[in-house]
């Protein structure tokens, strides 16, 4: 039992229930009472910030090819929800309304009627490189976001990436307490399988990712980023490092925590923020753990 429960962030919205990153998924997360929501962002060919995880369209839409090669209008013509198979209430919008830009998501959060967090993951490698960061910051600023407090009305904004260069770039513009350095263990076989690479290319890519992991750990060791964002597997495999970062004052946002035993691990470790595909279920579990 604990006296203060961790905050629960909805990973790509309530993405176990509805297709990730869709209007329906985020509206459901808000309705579930999530303390915050997480999103991944890419730039379109005409420089709009869209909410998608993959650099390609194939997995989560009826389109194909790179997100960066399409305009926003072209993306709006695609179906981003039917692949999931779940029907959603009419009030969550039509199929044609499910793709969201960052301004679209901000509109939904501002209407939540309560304080809510927004964790924005900037996806790299990007063909637009650090223009992605500049564009996201410009979108936020246009809405009245204050970079020092990282607040936009009722929305608490944090920015995060697995890319150490992107994180260092953000740290020059936003206080460290609002910047999350994502980190996870890199396994060569997982890289090869996920990216469908051969042994030589897969090994080379894995070595690059391992170097980035080491840089990320250095950033967190030094306290340059205020928020540590490890995967739940990393938390299990590196308890001493996790404890050291916590003791040194890093705030933790752990992903993706769906299984009850993983929630318990986070509670026992004193993790402050949990990112999950199942916000309603995790909220019930962490609520029951509060004294």
Model-found features: residue ranges?
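Residues at alpha-helix caps and immediate loop-helix transition turns in enzyme cores, especially N-
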Residues: 21-22, 131-133, 241
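Short, glycine/acidic-enriched loop or turn micro-motifs at the edges of active sites
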Residues: 14, 41-43, 56-57, 124, ...
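Metal-dependent phosphodiesterase/phospholipase catalytic core, i.e.
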Residues: 53-172, 177-187, 196, 200-210, ...
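C-terminal active-site rim and adjoining tail of enzyme catalytic domains
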Residues: 180-183, 189-291
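N-terminal amphipathic alpha-helix/helix-capping segment at the start of soluble metabolic enzymes
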Residues: 1-13, 106
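Catalytic domains of carbohydrate-active enzymes, especially glycoside hydrolases
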Residues: 25-43, 105, 219-228
């Amino acid at each position: 039992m604990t006296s203060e429960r961790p905050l629960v962030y909805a990973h790509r919205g309530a993405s176990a229930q509805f297709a990730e990153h869709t209007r329906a998924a985020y509206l459901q997360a808000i309705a579930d009472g999530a303390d915050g929501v997480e999103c991944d962002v890419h730039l379109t060919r005409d420089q709009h910030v869209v909410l998608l995880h993959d650099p390609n369209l194939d997995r989560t839409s009826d389109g194909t090819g790179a997100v960066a090669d399409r305009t926003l209008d072209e993306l709006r013509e695609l179906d981003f929800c039917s692949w999931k198979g779940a029907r959603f209430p009419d009030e969550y919008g039509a199929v044609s309304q499910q793709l969201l830009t960052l301004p679209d998501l901000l509109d939904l959060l501002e209407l939540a009627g309560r304080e809510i967090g927004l964790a924005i993951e900037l996806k790299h490698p990007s063909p637009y490189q650090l223009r992605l960061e500049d564009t996201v910051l410009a979108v936020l600023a246009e809405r009245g976001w204050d970079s020092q407090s990282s607040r936009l009305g009722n929305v608490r904004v944090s920015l995060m990436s697995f890319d150490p260069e992107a994180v260092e770039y953000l740290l020059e513009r936003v206080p460290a307490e609002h910047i999350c350095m994502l980190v996870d263990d890199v396994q060569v076989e997982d890289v090869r399988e996920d990216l469908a690479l051969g042994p030589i290319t897969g090994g080379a890519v894995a070595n690059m990712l391992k170097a980035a992991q080491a840089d990320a750990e250095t950033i967190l060791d030094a306290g340059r980023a205020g928020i540590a964002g490890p995967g739940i597997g990393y938390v299990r495999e590196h308890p001493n490092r996790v404890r050291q970062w916590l003791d040194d004052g890093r705030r933790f946002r752990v992903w993706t925590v769906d299984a009850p035993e993983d929630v318990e691990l986070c509670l026992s470790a004193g993790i402050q923020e949990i990112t999950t595909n199942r916000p309603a279920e995790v909220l019930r579990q962490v609520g029951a753990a509060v004294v």
